[in-house]
From Swiss-Prot:
Pathway(s): Bacterial outer membrane biogenesis; enterobacterial common antigen biosynthesis
Keyword terms of this UniProt record: Cell inner membrane, Cell membrane, Glycosyltransferase, Membrane, Transferase
Gene: wecF
Protein known as: TDP-N-acetylfucosamine:lipid II N-acetylfucosaminyltransferase
GO cellular component terms, A-Z: plasma membrane
Entry membrane topology: Peripheral membrane protein
Cysteine-cysteine disulfides: none
Length: 361
């Protein structure tokens, strides 16, 4: 029996908590302990074991400490297996590249950002080159359809499988009929967080050019922390374009139910990041019948079209009539069949964890 250790290698509380909750509340009820129980998590503030009684969680104060713990285990027992959830930890990449961790010991679920090279400068170019080499030294890679297509071009010999992030969704809401009011200004959601990859200011200018100032704009920027300067820049531009009445910037992270209620009020989402991210928010918008604009560089468009969902591309002509038509198309889709919705993504996780421990699927 192979024990699988799940690695959350960077201190990203929101995403890490989602994964831990999914394993504790869902997978632990049906899968064997050796597949789901053992976690190593980077968390400066720590994690309460009482919140996840079905799991055994070892916390490390930072990424480097976590990487050292994983490397020590990998070297002490070459039969030990690791499942990397996301992978924003340079020390682990270097350990794979140097052979301290063997390819056959590692499966990796891509979260998106680690595939893309957005920073500039000599230091980053060198690191990206090393990371590309390390990413070819993985036993098995799991990702969205679009990310797999990107990865397979660069590492064609590595086995891959489709797998979706376990978005927190209430399946009962998928059946809910949503009627969008046709009167009054449209409400547009810009971005899924305060991260600069959302390119908030560029999105606000594009919305103003397409729709004028007679739309309501909501910008959630509750995380990441220590982001006050960028938030102030976005707020200044948003108020100048749309005015106090039509521009709302959310500086605090909303409780989940409040976030859902906010999404229900939207007519359109606007997400122009040039990579796969924000799938959780995209799933919830689809559930509520809200179409969205995405960049052509975001490979998740391949997953959307595979599920026969309407796609609005950033840079194309857009007006209210096209938005309403996308809403109509979205309403006609059988959302219960969407592969990246709960509970449809569960089978992918069952298969992935069995594969990672060398068991038949």
């Amino acid at each position: 029996m192979t024990t699988l250790i799940h690695v959350l290698g960077s201190d990203i509380p929101h995403h890490n908590q989602t994964v831990l909750r999914f394993f504790n509340d869902v997978l632990a009820t049906e899968l064997p302990e050796h597949q789901i129980r053992h976690f190593i998590v980077a968390s400066h503030d720590g994690i309460s074991p009482a919140d996840f009684p079905a799991l055994r969680i070892e916390t490390c104060v930072d990424k480097k400490t976590l990487a050292e713990a994983v490397i020590a285990r990998a070297k002490s027992n070459r039969k030990m297996r690791f499942f990397l959830h996301g992978q924003f930890n340079p020390t682990l990449w270097l350990a794979l590249l140097s052979g301290k961790i063997k390819p056959e010991q590692v499966c990796w679920h891509v979260w998106g950002a680690d595939l893309y090279e957005e920073a500039n400068g000599l230091k980053y170019r060198l690191f990206y080159w090393l990371r590309r080499m390390a990413q070819k030294r993985i036993g098995h890679v799991f990702a969205t359809r679009g990310d797999l297509a990107w990865y397979e071009q660069r590492a064609p010999r590595v086995p891959t499988s489709l797998l979706y992030f376990p978005t927190r969704m209430d399946p009962a809401l998928t059946s809910m009929k949503v009627d969008k009011p046709l009167a009054g200004p449209m409400t547009i959601l810009v971005g899924n967080s305060g991260d600069r990859t959302n390119r908030h200011q560029e999105a606000l200018r594009a919305i103003h050019k397409q729709f004028g100032n007679n739309v309501r704009v909501i910008v959630p920027m509750g995380y990441p922390a220590n982001n006050a300067s960028y938030i102030a820049q976005v707020e200044k531009d948003g108020l100048a374009l749309f005015g106090v009445k039509n521009f709302q910037l959310l500086k605090d992270q909303l409780a989940f139910d409040d976030y859902l209620n906010m999404l229900r009020t939207c007519d359109l989402g606007y997400f122009i990041f040039d990579r796969q991210q924000g799938i959780g928010t995209l799933c919830l918008l689809i559930q509520f019948g809200v179409p969205f604009v995405i960049s052509r560089k975001n490979p998740f468009w391949q997953d959307l079209t595979e599920q026969s969902l309407p796609v609005l591309f950033y840079g194309d002509d857009l007006d209210e009539a096209l938005v309403r038509e996308a809403q109509r198309q979205l309403a006609s889709v059988d959302k219960h069949q969407i592969a990246f919705f709960n509970p449809n993504y569960l089978q992918g996780w069952r298969d992935a964890l069995a594969l990672a421990t060398g068991e038949p699927t």
